[in-house]
């Protein structure tokens, strides 16, 4: 079931992204989750992704696949080999919910990930727990040192935004900016983006 659903989701997302681009909306990248089970299908999954991109007319560089830390725990696994071939096609690969699993930093360094996405559980307490704040700061610094962009997941308050800006995070995602939207509402948001107020001036002691 997850294989069929995953393929359907990818096809719908790629087709919608192509429609937005054809309508002259801002160049964008769409993100789809890829499960370990899907990636472990190897060439069959790669062929499916390549076919969907070809049918939709979407440039592979406009697609990003999110994977969990478990996906690259074993060097040389079918899943890791599949990720490498997808990366060679031009697709961006990112680590989702980083900080929740047991990823080896060596493996993180050795794979050309485009970005790491900090787990919601760490972001949730970033303004109230100094230890979480320190871990988030360290992850952002590490990601930048490895030439990756860093995304904060689950951002829900202005205070979290201010803290993450201070740590120089690249992107933020969460209910503070928008709840999940149906396609029509999402299209209107892309056409006329309205972001909530953010205190962007960071005080210097």
Which functions belong to the PLM regions below?
Residues 3, 98, 126-134:
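Cytosolic catalytic cores of cyclic-nucleotide second-messenger enzymes
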Residues 50-126, 140-180:
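The catalytic core of metal-dependent phosphodiesterases that act on cyclic dinucleotides
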Residues 1-78, 154:
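Catalytic core of bacterial c-di-GMP phosphodiesterases, primarily the EAL and HD-GYP domains
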């Amino acid at each position: 079931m997850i294989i069929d659903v995953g393929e359907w989701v990818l096809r719908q997302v790629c087709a919608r992204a192509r429609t937005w681009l054809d309508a002259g909306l801002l160049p964008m990248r769409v993100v789809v989750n890829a499960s370990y089970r899907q990636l472990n299908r190897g060439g069959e999954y790669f062929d499916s992704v390549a076919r969907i991109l070809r049918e939709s007319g979407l440039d592979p560089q406009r697609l990003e696949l999110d994977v969990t830390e478990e996906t690259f725990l074993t060097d040389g696994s079918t899943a890791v080999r599949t990720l490498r071939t997808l990366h060679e096609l031009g697709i961006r690969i990112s680590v989702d919910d980083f900080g929740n699993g047991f990823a080896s930093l060596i493996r993180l360094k050795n794979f050309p990930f485009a970005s790491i996405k900090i787990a919601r559980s760490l972001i949730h307490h970033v303004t109230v727990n100094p230890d979480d704040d320190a871990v988030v700061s360290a992850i952002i610094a590490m990601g930048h040192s490895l030439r990756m962009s860093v995304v904060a997941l689950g951002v829900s308050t202005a205070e979290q935004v201010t803290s993450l800006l201070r740590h120089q995070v690249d992107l933020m995602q969460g209910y503070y900016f928008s709840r999940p939207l149906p396609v029509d509402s999402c299209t209107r948001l892309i056409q006329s983006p309205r972001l909530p107020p953010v205190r962007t001036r960071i005080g210097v002691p």
